[in-house]
């Protein structure tokens, strides 16, 4: 048996034991299939499972991260190993990236590990640590992200320490490879002929790496890119290495397990403590959210709550009562965000923006970027956005008010959302998160679940 470790791990003439392991460990239930089936939708063209391995003739091909998990089995056989990794000339970045003690320790641990995931709380400086990691490795690096906003934030941060002549970007359909670090969106890179990039980079760093397993689409895009790169070092950065649908295993198989966790205590003096204020809406369970058998349809429930006029007016009252603060209003429904925005008084509306995932055109991206920049600069005070965008690294330190307009239960969403207002900023008021809780048992249970997440984030008032 022969094992070739390159962009992927190829095992020639695998035994039945190895094939059985692949079927057991590298085939995941497709959450899209399960969701459609649960909602009674047609599932004809949706695969029931997602496979992380391939069979090619007498060989089985696995993601590189899976090698560690299967190695104990390989060790019981006579195996010949061969490595075919990228080996480019060293890069002298001539950069001194400032780090706190806990960041120094995190970078050291990741250097020693050589691959894997760095888990660090929101506001702890993951981007700073990632850039320091790339500089200390002194190798050609690909920085991979899933949004233009994150790419710009990371590029701007790197340019503070590294000469721009060493930096490049692959985004919006344009390819400009840097001699040092190239910042790329997975959407653009996945559309390229990836065979030409197989040995281009020695290091890949995936920002917000839990998004690798975000959806079957994003999993396919990230998997396609990462599995085509023969990088010796594959790293991931994330505040929440967690997914409610169990898809996080995909992330481990592509990048490796969590190698270092920055404890919450280490960053307590670097982030602000968020106060949680429960706001009882008095809204009973909507009849339209019940299926014929009396069970609650979650999708219908969220839509109905988002459309409740009296509920939205209550949220609007809380928003308008503090116009001097900097508000982030989050919802699962764009209709609700626009309803709230449209009912702002004219002078207040001039200080507000709505951003959503549909702003993908050149003009839309520019408007979204401008809205975020205006919030950063203090020119605007109200930002309406989806929970999804809040998970995608909204870096606006002056935010001090958070409104959860629709109920959430996912740990990663809560942690990321609260983290948006926990950043330190000169002259910033005590950050407050307003949690709007409705008047029925399921809503109260979801609030109790959120309270557990809040406590893990160091919040108080609960």
Regions found by a protein language model. Give the residues of each.
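Conserved pre-motif I regulatory segment
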Residues: 54-55, 73-76, 80-119
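Walker A/P-loop
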Residues: 113-137, 142
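Conserved nucleic-acid-binding Ia/Ib motif block in the N-terminal RecA-like helicase ATPase lobe
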Residues: 135, 139-191
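Conserved helicase ATPase core of P-loop NTP-dependent helicases/translocases
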Residues: 152, 166-178, 328, 338-339, ...
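Conserved helix/coil segment N-terminal to the catalytic DExD/H
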Residues: 171-203, 214-223, 389
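Post-DEXD/H (motif II) to motif III coupling segment of the RecA-like Helicase ATP-binding lobe
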Residues: 210-277, 454
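Conserved interdomain hinge at the start of the Helicase C-terminal
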Residues: 293-343
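Conserved RecA-like P-loop NTPase helicase motor core
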Residues: 357-457
């Amino acid at each position: 048996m022969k094992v070739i470790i390159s962009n992927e791990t190829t095992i020639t003439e695998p035994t039945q034991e190895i094939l059985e392991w692949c079927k057991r460990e590298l085939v995941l239930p497709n959450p899209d299939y399960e969701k459609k089936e649960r909602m009674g939708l047609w599932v004809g063209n949706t695969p029931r499972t997602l496979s992380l391995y391939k069979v090619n003739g007498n060989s089985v091909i696995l993601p590189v991260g899976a090698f560690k998990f299967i190695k104990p089995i390989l060790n019981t056989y006579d195996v010949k190993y061969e490595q075919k990794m990228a080996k480019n000339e060293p890069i002298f970045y001539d950069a001194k990236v400032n780090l706190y003690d806990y960041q120094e320790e995190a970078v050291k641990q990741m250097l020693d590990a050589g691959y894997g995931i760095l888990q660090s709380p929101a506001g702890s400086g993951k981007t700073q640590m990632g850039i320091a990691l790339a500089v200390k490795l002194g190798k050609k690096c690909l920085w991979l992200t899933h949004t233009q906003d994150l790419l710009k934030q990371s590029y701007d941060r790197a340019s503070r320490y590294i000469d721009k002549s060493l930096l490049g970007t692959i985004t919006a359909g344009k390819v400009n490879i840097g001699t040092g670090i190239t910042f790329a969106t997975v959407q653009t890179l996945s559309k390229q002929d990836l065979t030409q990039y197989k040995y281009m980079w020695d290091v890949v760093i995936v920002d917000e790496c839990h998004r690798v397993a975000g959806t079957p689409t994003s999993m396919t895009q990230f998997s396609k890119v990462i599995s085509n790169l023969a990088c010796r070092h594959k790293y991931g950065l994330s505040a929440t290495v967690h997914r409610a649908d169990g898809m996080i295993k995909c992330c481990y198989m592509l990048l490796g397990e969590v190698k270092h966790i920055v404890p919450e205590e280490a960053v307590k003096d670097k982030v602000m403590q968020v106060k949680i204020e429960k706001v009882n809406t008095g809204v009973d369970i909507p009849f339209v959210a019940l299926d014929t058998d009396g069970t609650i349809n979650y999708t219908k429930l969220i839509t109905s709550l988002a459309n409740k006029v009296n509920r939205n007016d209550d949220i609007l009252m809380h928003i308008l009562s503090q116009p001097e603060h900097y508000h982030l209003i989050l919802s699962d429904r764009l209709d609700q965000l626009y309803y709230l925005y449209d009912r702002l008084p004219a002078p207040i509306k001039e200080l507000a923006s709505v951003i959503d995932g549909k702003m993908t055109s050149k003009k839309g991206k520019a408007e979204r970027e401008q809205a975020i920049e205006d919030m950063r600069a203090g020119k605007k005070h109200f930002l309406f956005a989806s929970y999804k965008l809040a998970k995608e690294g909204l870096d606006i330190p002056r935010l001090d008010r958070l409104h959860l307009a629709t109920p959430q239960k996912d740990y990663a969403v809560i942690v990321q959302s609260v983290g948006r207002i926990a950043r330190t900023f000169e002259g910033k008021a005590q950050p407050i998160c307003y949690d709007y809780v409705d008047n029925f048992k399921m809503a109260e249970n979801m609030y109790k679940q959120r309270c557990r997440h809040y406590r893990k984030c160091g919040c108080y008032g609960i």
